[in-house]
Regions:
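Compositionally biased, charge-rich terminal segments
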Residues: 69, 238-253, 274
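Short, glycine-rich, amphipathic interfacial segments at transmembrane boundaries or analogous
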Residues: 45-46, 51-55, 113-164, 223-244
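A short, structured surface patch at a secondary-structure boundary
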Residues: 155-219, 259-267
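A hydrophobic, helix-centered structural microdomain
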Residues: 74-141, 186, 253, 258-274
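Short, well-ordered beta-strand elements within core beta-sheets of diverse protein domains
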Residues: 89, 168-176, 245-249
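N-terminal hydrophobic signal-anchor/signal peptide
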Residues: 1-94, 274
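Hydrophobic alpha-helical segments characteristic of transmembrane helices
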Residues: 35, 41-44, 179-187, 228-234
Length: 274
């Protein structure tokens, strides 16, 4: 083949190789010496999907495969949006605290903030913060209420008229999503993003199957595609995974902005939140 390429008009060479055939390194080197462009189709790697890119890592040329390939500048813009949003959100969190803290102390003595270990990007644990909307024994009572869970298989927990929610103030801050505001601190720290996927608890994470884990291929978010798609009506965890996967595969700055605007609408109309 080298002799033919050497003596004939050849612009490019495309190698379509079955799995059992080794890459023809010598011919490719010869083509490189002659300045002829080469392409190699690797059948085994094609099964990994379309999101593949050749890049240099630590001096080695590698083929990287991911659920979504994004550029460095896109990640930078997303992080800058998170920082800006996190700063503004933390200011509002302080203002909200001034108003709800006294009521919380009267209705349910205890800390105003609630913290819990959640699983972040690629399974990295982090501590998430919220305004406490439930009574102090909420986690203990959760085990007793699992049979009333609306989500199948216990991969998430959601129930109608949850008795653990503090009467009055608890229902109000959950209905208006004010309980989520302390997460702006998580966003500022880099544990979370403005838009992403819901971070699971450790016990939920332990029950994940292989395809569930892809939800955490990105940073978890304060809001996301699932949250703005009528989350109160969704009771099948596989549907949650499908929406999260769709978001990750189609991610763009424009999609984030669209979800943020839709989130504002959902919060002010109260749709989708319970």
């Amino acid at each position: 083949m080298t002799a033919y390429i050497h003596k004939n008009w050849v612009d490019e060479v495309f190698f379509a190789l079955p799995e059992h055939v080794d890459i023809p390194k010598k011919i490719m080197k010869d083509c490189n010496r002659m300045g002829v462009v080469t392409h190699v189709q690797l059948a085994a790697l094609n099964e990994l999907g379309k999101n593949q890119v050749v890049e240099e890592i630590a001096g080695y040329m590698v083929l990287s495969s991911s659920i979504n390939i994004v550029s460095s500048w896109q990640l930078l813009v997303k992080r800058l949006m998170d920082i800006a949003g996190g700063l503004v959100g933390c200011i509002f969190t302080g203002i909200i605290y001034i108003f709800i803290a006294p009521i919380m102390k009267v209705k349910s003595p205890g800390p105003v903030f609630f913290s819990q270990v959640r699983m972040g990007k690629n399974g990295k644990p982090f501590k998430i913060y919220k305004f406490r909307s439930m009574y102090m024994d909420a986690e203990e009572r959760k085990k007793e209420l699992m049979e009333k869970n609306n989500i199948k298989d216990g991969l998430m927990f959601k129930m109608d008229d949850d008795p653990r929610i503090i009467k009055g103030i608890g229902h109000f801050i959950r209905k208006t999503s004010l309980d989520e505001f302390p997460q702006f601190w998580n966003i500022l720290k880099g544990d979370m993003s403005l838009v992403g996927t819901r971070p699971p608890t450790m016990d939920e994470w332990d029950k994940y199957e292989l395809h569930h884990r892809r939800r955490l291929a990105i940073k978890p978010g304060l809001t996301g595609m699932w949250q703005v798609s009528g989350r109160s009506e969704i009771t099948d965890f596989e549907e949650v995974v499908e929406l999260d996967t769709k978001y990750i595969e189609q991610w763009s700055i424009g999609l984030d902005i669209k979800i943020l605007f839709k989130t504002v609408t959902v919060v002010f109309t109260g749709s989708g939140a319970k």
